[in-house]
Swiss-Prot record:
The modification Phosphotyrosine is found at residue 257. The keyword ATP-binding does not apply. Residues 1-11 have a biased composition (Low complexity). Residues 1-113 are annotated as: Disordered. The gene is Eif3j1. This is Eukaryotic translation initiation factor 3 subunit J-A. One of its GO terms (cellular component) is eukaryotic 48S preinitiation complex. It comes from Mus musculus (Mouse). Belongs to the eIF-3 subunit J family. The modification Phosphothreonine is found at residue 112.
């Protein structure tokens, strides 16, 4: 009986030991369940990463991104080229309109020969300016200007200053043989677009200037005549008379003067 009791006690201890052993919580399960304070630190550690089948895939993606950027630049260049073409098209259309106006006769309004010439010159000037602007845009000419060309007068004072600069620029060539003809052509060309009343004002101003110059020229000629020598020995006779008044006779100083002469 005593032996059976001892065996039963030993079996009981073994069962309790097994129970204690298998009742322990699985550390892995406890960590996964968030039972411990430091469980979050290892969270996701065992998750499978998105591992690429081929290590060259990263390089291929980088190459694709690099190839996309030049496409953007090319599209920008295309936009610029399209803008340039549009400008050229508008410029060409404008030139064709000007050329058409130059060639077709004026039917709606009867113009005098002078007015027709003025209109043609004006249109020709517009066409030349249009051609010059197109050439600048085509060849990328820098439009940075200085001095007179940089001025853009709008007020009376601005035009006064602009006129002074133009005068200083032009009058430095007044000694040239072609200066007068140059001014004649210049005044005619710059006055083409003016109204009749404005032309009359300019004409009157030039007429007054011409009258003043004529008066000055006459006065200058009169002064030269007074200072001139009288022909036929008049100056010698006058000096002789003056000496005779001092001497009172034909000898003396007069005779000495004649001997000296």
């Amino acid at each position: 009986m005593a032996a059976a009791a001892a065996a039963a006690a030993a079996a009981g201890d073994s069962d309790s030991w097994d129970a204690d052993t298998f009742s322990m919580e699985d550390p892995v399960r406890k960590v996964a369940g968030g039972g411990t304070a430091g469980g979050d630190r290892w969270e996701g550690e065992d998750e499978d990463e998105d591992v690429k089948d081929n290590w060259d895939d990263d390089d291929d993606e980088n190459k694709e991104e690099a190839e996309v950027k030049p496409e953007v630049k090319i599209s920008e260049k295309k936009k610029i080229a399209e803008k340039i073409k549009e400008k050229e098209r508008q410029q060409k259309k404008r030139q064709e309109e000007i050329k058409k106006r130059l060639e077709e006769p004026e039917e709606s309004k009867v113009l005098t020969p002078e007015e027709q010439l003025a209109d043609k010159l004006r249109l020709k000037k517009l066409q030349e300016e249009s051609d010059l602007e197109l050439a600048k845009e085509t060849f990328g000419v820098n439009n940075t200007v200085y001095g007179i060309d940089a001025m853009n007068p709008s007020s009376r004072d601005d035009f006064t200053e602009f006129g002074k600069l133009l005068k200083d620029k032009i009058t430095q060539y007044e000694k040239s043989l072609y200066y007068a003809s140059f001014l004649e052509a210049l005044v005619r060309d710059v006055c083409i677009s003016l109204e009749i009343d404005d032309l009359k004002k300019i004409t009157n101003s030039l007429t007054v200037l011409c009258s003043e110059k004529q008066k000055q020229e006459k006065q200058s000629k009169a002064k030269k005549k007074k200072k001139g020598v009288v022909p036929g020995g008049g100056l010698k006779a006058t000096m002789k008379d003056d000496l005779a008044d001092y001497g009172g006779y034909e000898g003396g100083y007069v005779q000495d003067y004649e001997d000296f002469m």
